[in-house]
Amino acid sequence: MSVESRVLVVDAGNTSIKFTAFEGEQVLWVLRGDSCPAETDFAPQVIYFASVRSKEQSALLHADVQAAFPSSEWITLTSQATACCVRNAYIEPERLGIDRWLGVVAAHHLIKGNVVVVDAGTAIKVDVVNSEGAHLGGYIAPGLAMMTESLLSKTARIRFDSHEVVEGEGLPNSTARAVTEGCHEMALGFLERIHHLYPEFKWVVTGGDAQALLNRLGIALECFPNLVALGAKLVGDEQLRGNK
């Protein structure tokens, strides 16, 4: 099978599942959902599967997708010591989250230089890669929603309704603003600290909260919503070539 084929990337994150269809190098569509989007005219020749979920949850999703596309070839992606000219910094490479690994690979190939990779989703994950493709390591911190939920779950009287979350100028003057803007400032301070450590590196950002941070960070960023899927395509194609 040529790698220039119809590919479905299944990216099972902590809170959502993202399905990305490729025709060659072109992204045809991207869908999010809890189950496989079988109601499409797209028939993948190969499926690249990447999951950060538990073994049990991953197995259920695997069965769901395989039932929808029984004739498709299947490659489960895992973090490796090296892939696509990128070297994993982890002593135990397989313990680096597959979403982080695929983001690192994609960012290196997109930027071809020193780059900081930020995935702002359920967690805020930051990885640093140099121009030679060496992954230098990274960080994992709570995402914006996780910080808010943690604060609310551990306090009795910090409460607000979603309609109370409005933008304002100056210091927050309501509980809703105090919590939401406080969590934003925590995330921004974390990212600004990393920028201080790597001021000459380019920045690539992805994830559901990417735009919210992008607008307030004051750092030149490039946003790639499909970064993990692009990395999956690169790594999957390399493995597919190796299997033939």
Swiss-Prot record:
Cofactor(s) listed: NH4(+); K(+)
Record carries keyword Transmembrane helix: no
**Active-site annotation:** D99 (proton acceptor)
Binding annotation for ATP: D11, A12, G13, N14, T15, S16, I17, K18, T122
* Ligand binding (substrate): Y90, G97, I98, D99, R100, T175
Q: Which UniProt keywords apply?
A: ATP-binding, Coenzyme A biosynthesis, Cytoplasm, Kinase, Metal-binding, Nucleotide-binding, Potassium, Transferase
**Which SUPFAM superfamilies has this protein been placed in?**
Actin-like ATPase domain
As for subcellular location, the record says: Cytoplasm
The record's subunit annotation is: Homodimer.
Q: What does this protein do?
A: Catalyzes the phosphorylation of pantothenate (Pan), the first step in CoA biosynthesis.
Specify the protein name: Type III pantothenate kinase
Name the lineage: Bacteria, Pseudomonadati, Pseudomonadota, Gammaproteobacteria, Oceanospirillales
